[in-house]
Amino acid sequence: MGVRSPSSADSATIADDIAIIRSMHTEAINHDPAITFINTGTMQLGKASLGAWLSYGLGSETENFPAYMVMLSQGTGKNPGQPIYSRLWGSGFLPSEHQGVLLRAGADPVLYLDNPPGVKRSQRRGQLDDLARLNQAFAQQTGDPETLARIQAYEMSYRMQASVPDLTDLSKEPDSTFDLYGPESRKPGTYAANCLMARRLVERGVRCVQLFHRGWDQHIALQSQLPRQCQDTDQPSAALILDCLLYTSPSPRDCKT
């Protein structure tokens, strides 16, 4: 029958539509190797993450975003919680184009996306074309696949200069959407806001969206800390699944994560 918790009442309503992995275990006694194992299949560094494998195996459905994107949030249950490292969404030995790209809250959602000061978009296009020719020549000379991945990264950044502002503009989202995800969804960087952003990424064709929410390491004060942490995630998680299911097919909001 399972254990029921009032702290996850909304999540209980979508339990039939989510996958919970109960078979995974590790001999690691510390958080870092354990979470590395969960995300990469090994406690050792240097292996590809789950999202990178999905990108590598299934490819991308959009030219305007990476196939794998990641968002972080800090919970209210325990602050600051355990650290999160970028290797958890790394590509390991796979081509670097498959690593996750971090989407942040605020005015600069993706680092190093803007053109240098004083450089117009047309000038940037010319620079990238010249740079691509040089990189192509170097790739033919050395056979280094990372050189080709670098070209793809530059081109993706150029396209994202137009696609990211549209992604992060929530002005056309109705109030009913924010009501569905909860009041925290209006606050950039919260788990609720990231869930809403995850739906927007999925409907734009991003293959894998991964949300990390820190603050689950409750050793003490469970009665006060754990309910707050669950409150962060319960309604938004259920809303994300319901939002995807509501527009499954033939609508463009086809949830594939």
Regions of interest found by a model, annotated:
Residues 1-249, 253:
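Ligand-binding pockets and gating/stacking loops
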Residues 256-257:
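N-terminal low-complexity segments that are often proline-rich with Ser/Thr-Pro
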